[in-house]
Amino acid sequence: MSRTARVERVTKETKVLVEIDLDGSGKADIETGVGFYDHMLHQIARHGGFDLTVHTVGDLHIDAHHTMEDTALALGSAVDRALGDRAGIRRYGSATVPMDEVLVRAAVDISGRPYVVHDEPPLAPYIGPVYPTSMTRHVWESFGQSARVTLHVDVLRAARPGGHPDAHHVVEAQFKAVSRALREATAVDPRFTGVVPSTKGTL
């Protein structure tokens, strides 16, 4: 059974196309106009093992907010649709990812109940010219809402001796950890083929 989805989201602020194959090999075709965000979405494809296409045209003449938010909403919707009735999946996934001095833990429950907890230290306001670090939390919140998942992302360690956290490392480790957790949670459990992983019988 194919676990793929295509989502188009069009507003007066953005036009977003997302295609995903949960059982892919990490292929990615990403273009949002926000270079560092593109780099992060490539992490989702590579470390999640998903084939992922994301094409976004947004009102970047204003700022990156709408572009990043609507892309995350469309990505979450694509994951939700690709999962179908969620039968046979592992449901839970977690990963702890180091990136030099940074250590991040992510945990996912494909629960049908959107809830996001995000904890990171204060960071420099921008990575590159247009990626506002304040948007990382909002990306996870938007993704969690539309994917209908519970998501915890905790930066466990970030400080460099005698210096401020490296924002690039802190954010990239988050995307890698979430990707690895999603890979585990969306994986098919061969012991429970066709069985929804809930005593309620639905997610």
UniProtKB/Swiss-Prot annotation:
One of its GO terms (biological process) is L-histidine biosynthetic process. It comes from the Bacteria. GO terms for cellular component: cytoplasm. The keyword Amino-acid biosynthesis applies. SUPFAM superfamilies: Ribosomal protein S5 domain 2-like (SSF54211). It is found in: Cytoplasm. The keyword Transcription does not apply. Its EC number is 4.2.1.19. One of its GO terms (molecular function) is imidazoleglycerol-phosphate dehydratase activity. Keywords: Amino-acid biosynthesis, Cytoplasm, Histidine biosynthesis, Lyase. It catalyses: D-erythro-1-(imidazol-4-yl)glycerol 3-phosphate = 3-(imidazol-4-yl)-2-oxopropyl phosphate + H2O. Pathway: Amino-acid biosynthesis; L-histidine biosynthesis; L-histidine from 5-phospho-alpha-D-ribose 1-diphosphate: step 6/9. CDD domains: IGPD. NCBIfam families: PRK00951.1-6. Belongs to the imidazoleglycerol-phosphate dehydratase family. This is Imidazoleglycerol-phosphate dehydratase. It comes from Salinispora tropica (strain ATCC BAA-916 / DSM 44818 / JCM 13857 / NBRC 105044 / CNB-440). The lineage of its organism: Bacteria, Bacillati, Actinomycetota, Actinomycetes, Micromonosporales. The gene is hisB.
